[in-house]
Design a protein with these regions (language model features):
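Low-complexity, S/T/G/P-rich flexible repeat/linker segments used as non-globular hinges
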Residues: 125-146
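Proline- and acidic/polar-enriched loop/turn elements at helix boundaries
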Residues: 32-34, 69
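Residue-level detector of intrinsically disordered/flexible regions characterized by low predicted structural confidence
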Residues: 4, 108-109, 143
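N-terminal single-pass transmembrane signal-anchor helix
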Residues: 2-30
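Extracellular/periplasmic head regions of type IV pilus-like filament subunits
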Residues: 58-131
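Membrane-proximal N-terminal amphipathic helix
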Residues: 35-62
Length: 146
């Protein structure tokens, strides 16, 4: 009678193969979940920026000078733009408790305006867009309308 205190080579190979198959199916699911979460965070950040810029517009409207925050030179809300002095003396960072949000890859969003004249009414829109090619929310936009 043989005393067996360990695994045979075949048992070890089968176990490693099964673990490999399980990991192979779990990694894409994990990656997809991370990507969806990052996209949600980016869209939430863009929505927060839009809401703050809309509030800035309404705050200035109350004192008789309605306008959106100044546009960045190259549309990117980067470090240079974050320190730009706005019409009321604040910087964009000050509108966000000292930290204008970036996307999950730490890249700035794009900010620009659009205007439409429809039925004799002028509609102004601000657009916040993710332009980072590596971002899961690439080309997603959040639009605010006045």
């Amino acid at each position: 009678m043989k005393n067996s205190n360990g695994f045979t080579l075949i048992e070890l190979v089968v176990t490693i193969a099964l673990v490999g198959i399980l990991l192979g199916s779990a990694i894409p699911t994990f990656h997809r979940a991370v990507s969806e979460t990052q996209s949600s965070v980016n869209i939430s950040n863009m929505t927060i920026i839009k809401q703050s810029f809309m509030q800035y517009y309404y705050d200035n409207h109350m004192i008789g000078d309605p306008h959106f925050p100044r546009l960045p030179q190259d549309s990117l809300m980067d470090n240079t733009y974050r320190q730009t002095i706005l019409g009321d003396g604040r910087t964009p960072d000050m509108l966000f408790s000292g930290n204008l949000p970036y996307n999950t890859n730490q890249k700035p969003y794009i900010y620009y305006w659009e205007s439409d004249t429809l039925n004799g009414h002028i509609t102004n829109r601000i657009v916040i867009q993710d332009s980072d090619l590596d971002s899961p929310s690439y080309n997603e936009k959040v639009v605010g309308e006045i």
